[in-house]
């Protein structure tokens, strides 16, 4: 007869009317009993012939692709002018005095952040924007391009200009070596008074026939300032600063993506000073002489008259011919849905390319991408805005993968010890937290995103046309991409983007200037950054509490008024560092803080309401006696595991599920096991804060007997049959707790000390978890353990009781670090004197 739920509860000693613990508990360690129960509950029957169930409620297999929905009305979020102050360490010093070693180390990690992959795989530009929404290809293309353009304008991306240079918007950092109109500006590291040392050497950017001569000049200019050699020094030295043949030129040198159809080299001097203004298309009448002013770095405007007419004309034709969009102007419409009609809507489509305010040298950057991008909803609650997903997963795969640094996250108990108090709480929202941290330009060639331009993107996705060879294109295959769908999409998009359609239809390659989200390094760097900042804040306001996890920052203070003044002070400090907060999203929690999925109050910690609801729904949908795919079980365990510490039996109750996932076999819920789990998760108990205290109760065991020392009283007992040492140590700890009721027990067994009971016999683990709930353990070396003698059957010998103080841990969060701490070889774990026990000190 299968085991009923009531019998199973009795067996696990969850009911009060169980017999004496010393007799009942050792039975649960018996292998035979565990095996029989597993068979009764159908836990061991892994090989099933019935087809597996692949969906339970909302849970599908871990890797099943839930198809995201595309929203044509997505708004691109705006990014404030985020610029983290470069002298952040000095700013913190002014705020709090000398920094501790830890804080300094963490802040140096991100100023600037560096990224060293083992191998970088370059992908063709066509893979830049992922065809994630086959129904909305063109729409998605333009929305993504607009998002990337917004990021570039906000100074979060570099734009690749040539193989060795990039441009960006926003304020430059001292490690970004600036080039101005083809010159390298060498700067010293201090950037405050702009006392940068700028020798006026002329380094023409593109590789030119006068290579050695210019390189030697650059080499000299590193040694010291030289006489200014005029704006066109490169040309005066006997040779034309020619741009690499056949690439349409702009005042910025080569764009480096689209080859132009004019085959000859342009001999105009437009790499060191500007020849034509950005795009020759703006001037409808191609005048033989073009004049344009451009401010040189020294401040005087250089006018360039009388450029030979043939060169200016060849350039203007080159830029029109190389521009897929504008070519439609000179062609005949192929149908009523021809792009010719859209291109002729307005005369001035603006420039073919935009350039940033600053231009810097970069390592060699190929015209490729290293990761694809696509758009999704910003979050489940906000579907009106989009979020860019960047896939740099190549760095986490294969045998060349980067092993990302590990970092400490406080576990549930440490978090409760730290935050469970009667403080008032408030949480801050850092807007675009990842985009605060600057990356070194050397990382740019590894983190490239972009697109191959609309023509190739459409050609790649439409089945009837080949990818056009830009070099030898005829008017006919220019029109290959015309279609009704494209025409309709572009007409609608024209309302949104206007003449930007032209700009966005060009190819572009962008590298990250701030850390992107799709790289495993980013969460680590963000965690280091926010924890260092919070550490500084905690030391500046010792009577308050500041804590962070990733971009989630919480502040706690004794009273609401106090909290508001703390909020004002901390906000000003963060703004002075260049950290952008979102004041609309500041949440005031009162006395129970919502943080990391938990509700934390003075009574302890519980999971948030939405998680409890999810668990209830999960049990409602959970089928009985049907094998469930182990990938779905992974999902179920993920949800139940989060709330396991709040149940009677904890993690051990989920062990049968873990076992089936490890064996990659389907799992079948028997009615009893489902009822047992359901009951477990109906009543959740808070995890309470551990209190410091003196340990008075000790437990010890040998394979045949156990012994307790409770105050001056000694007890001993024997087991019917010898048991493994870890099992008997756990039994002894359970007896000590049930006999004395003490919440603090001394033991010499590391497994019991760890409070992970998942490796014990299943029934024993479940029962022990309930008996030892809320118990703290202190380590006692065996030689000093007063319960050692009774466990060996010797009651007469007394070892003196130890005075063992217990201090609850707060993980790696040192709350009261002395300013500036003297680093000892092994730092003590810093004691968290709760704000409850510390008399309030004025700031």
UniProtKB/Swiss-Prot annotation:
Domain notes: Terminal protein domain (TP) is hepadnavirus-specific. Spacer domain is highly variable and separates the TP and RT domains. Polymerase/reverse-transcriptase domain (RT) and ribonuclease H domain (RH) are similar to retrovirus reverse transcriptase/RNase H.
Region (Spacer): 178-346
Chain positions of site Priming of reverse-transcription by covalently linking the first nucleotide of the (-)DNA: 63
Terminal protein domain (TP): annotated segments: 1-177
Binding-site positions, Mg(2+): 429, 551-552
Domain Reverse transcriptase stretches: 357-600
Keywords of the record: DNA replication, DNA-binding, DNA-directed DNA polymerase, Endonuclease, Host-virus interaction, Hydrolase, Inhibition of host innate immune response by virus, Inhibition of host RLR pathway by virus, Magnesium, Metal-binding, Multifunctional enzyme, Nuclease, Nucleotidyltransferase, RNA-directed DNA polymerase, Transferase, Viral immunoevasion
Skewed-composition ranges (Low complexity): 223-235
Catalytic activity of the protein: DNA(n) + a 2'-deoxyribonucleoside 5'-triphosphate = DNA(n+1) + diphosphate; Endonucleolytic cleavage to 5'-phosphomonoester
Entry-linked InterPro entries: DNA/RNA_pol_sf, DNApol_viral_C, DNApol_viral_N, HBV_DPOL, Rev_trsase/Diguanyl_cyclase, RT_dom, Viral_Replic_Matur_Polypro
Name of this chain's protein: Protein P
UniProt organism field: Hepatitis B virus genotype B2 (isolate Indonesia/pIDW420/1988)
This protein's record includes keyword Lipid biosynthesis: no
């Amino acid at each position: 007869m299968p085991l009923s739920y009531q019998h199973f509860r009795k067996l696990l000693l969850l009911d009060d009317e169980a017999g004496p613990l010393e007799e009942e508990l050792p039975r649960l360690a018996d292998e035979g009993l565990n095996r029989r129960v597993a068979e009764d509950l159908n836990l061991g029957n892994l090989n099933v012939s019935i087809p597996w169930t692949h969906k339970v409620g909302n849970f599908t297999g871990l890797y099943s692709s839930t198809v995201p929905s595309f929203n044509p009305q997505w708004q691109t979020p705006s990014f404030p002018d985020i610029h983290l102050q470069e002298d952040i360490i000095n700013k913190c010093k002014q705020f709090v005095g000398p920094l501790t070693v830890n804080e300094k180390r963490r802040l140096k990690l991100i100023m600037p952040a560096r990224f060293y992959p083992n191998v970088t795989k370059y992908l063709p530009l066509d893979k830049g924007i992922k065809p994630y929404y086959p129904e909305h290809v063109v729409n998605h293309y333009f929305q993504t391009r607009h998002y990337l353009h917004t990021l570039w304008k906000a100074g979060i991306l570099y734009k690749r200009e040539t193989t060795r240079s990039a441009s960006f918007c926003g304020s430059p950092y001292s490690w970004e070596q600036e080039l101005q109109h083809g010159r390298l500006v060498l700067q010293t590291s201090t950037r405050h008074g702009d006392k940068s040392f700028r020798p006026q050497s002329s380094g023409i950017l593109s590789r030119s026939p006068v290579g050695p001569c210019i390189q030697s000049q650059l080499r000299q200019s590193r040694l010291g300032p030289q006489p200014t050699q005029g704006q066109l020094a490169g040309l005066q030295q006997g040779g034309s600063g020619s741009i690499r043949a056949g690439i349409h030129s702009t005042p910025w040198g080569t764009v480096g993506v689209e080859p132009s159809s004019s085959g000859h080299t342009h001999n105009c001097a437009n790499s060191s000073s500007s020849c034509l203004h950005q795009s020759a298309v703006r001037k409808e009448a191609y005048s033989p002489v073009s004049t344009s002013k451009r401010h040189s770095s020294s401040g005087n405007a250089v006018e360039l008259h009388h450029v030979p007419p043939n060169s200016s004309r060849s350039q203007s034709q080159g830029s029109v011919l190389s521009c897929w969009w504008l070519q439609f102007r000179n062609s005949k419409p192929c149908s009523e849905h021809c792009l010719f009609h859209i291109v002729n809507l307005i005369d001035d489509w603006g420039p073919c390319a935009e350039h940033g305010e600053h231009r810097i040298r970069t390592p060699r950057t190929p015209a490729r991408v290293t990761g694809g991008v696509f758009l999704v909803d910003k979050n489940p609650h906000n579907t009106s805005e989009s979020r860019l997903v960047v896939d740099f997963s190549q760095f986490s795969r294969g045998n060349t993968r980067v092993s990302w640094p590990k970092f400490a996250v406080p576990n549930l108990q440490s978090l409760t010890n730290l935050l469970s108090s009667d403080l008032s709480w408030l949480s801050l929202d850092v807007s675009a937290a990842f985009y605060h941290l600057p990356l070194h330009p050397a990382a740019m060639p590894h983190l490239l995103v972009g697109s191959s331009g609309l023509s190739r993107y459409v050609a790649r996705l439409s089945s009837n046309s080949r990818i056009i060879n830009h070099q030898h294109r005829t008017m006919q295959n220019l029109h290959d991409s015309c279609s009704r769908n494209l025409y309709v999409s572009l007409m609608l998009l024209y309302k949104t983007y206007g003449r930007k359609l032209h700009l966005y239809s060009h190819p572009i390659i962008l590298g990250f200037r701030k850390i992107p989200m799709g790289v495993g390094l980013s969460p680590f760097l963000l965690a280091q950054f926010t924890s260092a900042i919070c550490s500084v804040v905690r030391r500046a306001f010792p009577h308050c509490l500041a804590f962070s996890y990733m971009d989630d920052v919480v502040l706690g203070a004794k009273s609401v008024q106090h909290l508001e003044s703390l909020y004002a002070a901390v906000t000003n400090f963060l703004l002075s560092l260049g950290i952008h907060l979102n004041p609309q999203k500041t949440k005031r929690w009162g006395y129970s803080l919502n943080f990391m999925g938990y509700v934390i109050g003075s009574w302890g910690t519980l999971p948030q309401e939405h998680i409890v609801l999810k668990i209830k729904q999960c049990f409602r949908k959970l089928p009985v006696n049907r094998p469930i795919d182990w990938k779905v079980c992974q999902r179920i365990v993920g949800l139940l595991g989060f709330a396991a510490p709040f149940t009677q039996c904890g993690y051990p109750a989920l062990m049968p599920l873990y076992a089936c996932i490890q064996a990659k076999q389907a799992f079948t819920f028997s009615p009893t096991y489902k009822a047992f789990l359901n009951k477990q998760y109906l009543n959740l108990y808070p995890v309470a804060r551990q209190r410091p205290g003196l340990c008075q109760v000790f437990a010890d065991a040998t394979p045949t007997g156990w012994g307790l020392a409770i105050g001056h009283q000694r007890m001993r007992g024997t087991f019917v049959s010898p048991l493994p040492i870890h099992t008997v140590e756990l039994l002894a700890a359970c007896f000590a707790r049930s006999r004395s009721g003490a919440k603090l027990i001394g033991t010499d067994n590391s497994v019991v000390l760890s409070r992970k009971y998942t490796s014990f016999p299943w029934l024993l683990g479940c029962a022990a978890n309930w008996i030892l709930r809320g118990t703290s353990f202190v380590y006692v070396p065996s030689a000093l353990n007063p319960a050692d003698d009774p466990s060996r059957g010797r009651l007469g010998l007394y070892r003196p009781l130890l005075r063992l103080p217990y201090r609850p841990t707060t993980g790696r969060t040192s709350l009261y670090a002395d300013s500036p701490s003297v680093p000892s070889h092994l730092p003590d774990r810093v004691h968290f004197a709760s704000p409850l026990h510390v008399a309030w000190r004025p700031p």
